[in-house]
Structures are given as C-alpha cells and as structure tokens.
C-alpha cells in the first residue's frame, strides 16, 4: 500500500535498531524488490492453499499478491512484468482450491465468511467482537441514508446510515445498456446519475454492493457495526490478471479468453456476455471496473492503463471540476504526510511538486 500510494515511504525492517530511530527513505523500485523477495522467501513457510484458517494468509495469498505486484511493475519500477503476473495468477488458479462464487452479490454480505469458494484472503469484521467506526462499518454506513434507502429500496442492515459516499455517472457508464442484465450492477442512479453539487447526497449513483445483511435476508448481528468481511483477494482478480497479460501479448491467448469469459458468464448468468476473442485493453479496464468497483482497485488500474490523470479518459468531477478534466501527472502519488517529514527531516524528501 505504501509503495502504491506514496511511492517512496520511510522504511524499517528487522535490522533497524530499537529505540528512537529516524527511518531511512526507500525508493519505490527498491521497495518493490524487497516485497518481491520477502514474498518468495516465505512461500515454503506458508500453509498450502486453503489449508489455513479463514482470514489468514497462505501460499495462494502470496501468489496473488505477487501477481498484483507484477501486473503493476512497470508503474513501480519502469520495467513491465506481465508474464510474471500471469504465471503467479495461474499458480492460484491451477491449485484447484478456489472457484467463482455462483452469486456475485453474496460475496459482499454479512455472512460472506460462509460457503465462499472465491475469496483467498479477507479482512474480517464482526459486529459483536470487532466493533469500530472504520472498515466495513464505514463503507456500508457511508453509502446509505434516508434518500438512498428510498431510491434503492434496498435494506443495508444498518441503523440509519450516514449519507456521504456515492459514485458518479462514470460507474453507470461502465455498465452501459447492461444494467438490467449484468448482475454485478448493484447500483441505482438518481435520475441520470449526474452530481451537480458534491455536498448533495441525493444526487449521483448509490452503491449497495456491500451490505450488513445475510444471504437469507436477515440483518447482521449489530445495526451499528458490520459483520461483513472485506475481500482483499478474489479468484476473479487472478482470472482478469491473466486475461490482461494475454491481451498485452505476455500470456496464452486461448487461456486468457477462457478466464475472462468465466468472469463474464458469472456476471450474466450464461454465455450471453462472452467474448468470441480477446477484446482491446480498453475493454479489460472497463471489465475490471465492473468487477471490482468499491473494492479499492480502480485508482491503481487507471494509473497502470495511463488514464488516471490523462485528458483522454475523464469522468465527472475528475480533477475537481464537474465535467472532469486532465490532472497533473504528479498526482499519481500522494504527498508524504507533513508530520512524517517534520519528524524526520534529514531522511525524508517530499514527492515531486508537493
């Protein structure tokens, strides 16, 4: 996360002395190599895929993280590693321990810890035993409120809701004319989905993907704190990682098409949405948007595809304007927090242009 968001963070490891220490700053490329080497070094120490208890990492988790790491290697290091991304995605797939959940929406419900063959690793929440105001409690409560409940008619399983987060029409446009047929479209637009004012919660696109409701329709155990677990890695990601590598000419084309169509078939409930051949990269980006919205992957994907700050791909309120516009490329990284720099001025340097 530090490598992805900040690029060049302060760094400590087991060799760092105890006591008052001013951590050195590590480059993004150096941190990439460190993470890669650590994941490979611990592989034999981890339990086999699906052999660990729910919510704990195993070998498949390490392979999935390596696949994600290699998929973004060109951004992080300047050298592409798409073939390696496909190799480690295939390790997870070939383990045979995971399969796509039949019902997409049940991946994101209060009992998603049960009978879930797709999730490799999750951040676990329990409304009785792990109460906090962040995590899934925030994500679910901030997505709903009085207006949202009226507009969607969907029970979110929470007491009231906080009113706040909603998507722009950009998410709506990803689904195009398939809102009624793509089962991943757990969204509801207010009118056209346009947001005229960012302070108005009754505008835009409501997202009810994550809910504190069980697959049987019962509310979670606590209306103030969510039971829903957050999926960090899903098999669908490994399928789409491989497919992207195939489109980029770095993995088997036939296998990439098969994996892509498995994701599509789950979304549509049949082969009606399947591709006859691998689509263009722009469609892979769109497919990832449809599959992983609200799961924290879109920014990273847009940067990898060169679309996060560019002017050839805009969405409402990009760069802070209603119509959307290009942004400065340096904003692909967040600034190093000022408190960190002030506490460690000799070692830390701010990211360029901040």
Enumerate the predicted regions with their spans.
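Short, surface-exposed recognition loops and adjoining beta-strand edges that mediate ligand/DNA contacts
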Residues: 12-15, 46-65, 69-145, 270-283, ...
């Amino acid at each position: 996360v530090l490598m992805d968001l900040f690029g060049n963070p302060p760094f400590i490891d087991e060799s760092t002395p105890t006591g008052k220490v001013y951590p050195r700053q590590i480059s993004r490329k150096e941190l990439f190599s460190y993470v890669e080497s650590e994941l490979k070094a611990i592989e034999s120490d981890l339990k086999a895929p699906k052999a660990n208890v729910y919510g704990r990492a195993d070998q498949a988790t390490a392979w999935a993280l390596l696949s994600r790491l290699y998929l973004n290697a060109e951004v992080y290091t300047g050298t592409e590693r798409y073939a390696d991304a496909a190799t480690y995605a295939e390790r997870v797939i070939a383990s045979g321990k995971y399969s796509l959940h039949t019902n997409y929406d049940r991946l994101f419900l209060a009992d998603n810890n049960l009978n879930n063959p797709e999730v490799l690793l999750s951040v676990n929440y329990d409304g009785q035993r792990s109460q906090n105001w962040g995590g899934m409690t925030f994500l679910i409560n901030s997505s709903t409120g009085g207006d949202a409940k009226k507009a969607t008619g969907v029970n979110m399983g929470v007491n009231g809701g906080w009113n706040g987060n909603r998507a722009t029409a950009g998410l709506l446009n990803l689904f195009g004319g398939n809102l009624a047929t793509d089962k991943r479209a757990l969204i509801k637009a207010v009118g056209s989905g346009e947001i005229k004012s960012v302070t108005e919660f009754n505008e835009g696109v409501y997202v009810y993907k994550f809910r504190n409701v069980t697959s049987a329709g019962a509310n979670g155990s606590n209306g103030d704190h969510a039971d829903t677990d957050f999926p960090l890695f899903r098999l669908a990601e490994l399928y789409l990682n491989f497919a992207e590598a195939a489109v980029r000419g770095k993995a088997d084309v036939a296998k990439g098409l098969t994996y892509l169509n498995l994701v599509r078939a789950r979304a549509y409930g049949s082969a009606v949405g399947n591709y006859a051949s691998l689509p263009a990269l722009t469609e892979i980006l769109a497919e990832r948007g449809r599959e992983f919205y609200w799961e924290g992957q879109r920014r990273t994907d847009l940067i990898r595809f060169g679309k996060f700050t560019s002017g050839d791909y805009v969405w409402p309120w990009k760069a802070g304007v209603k119509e959307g516009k290009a942004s400065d490329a340096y904003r692909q990284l967040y600034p190093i927090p000022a408190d960190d720099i002030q506490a460690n001025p000799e070692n830390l340097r701010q990211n360029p242009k901040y």
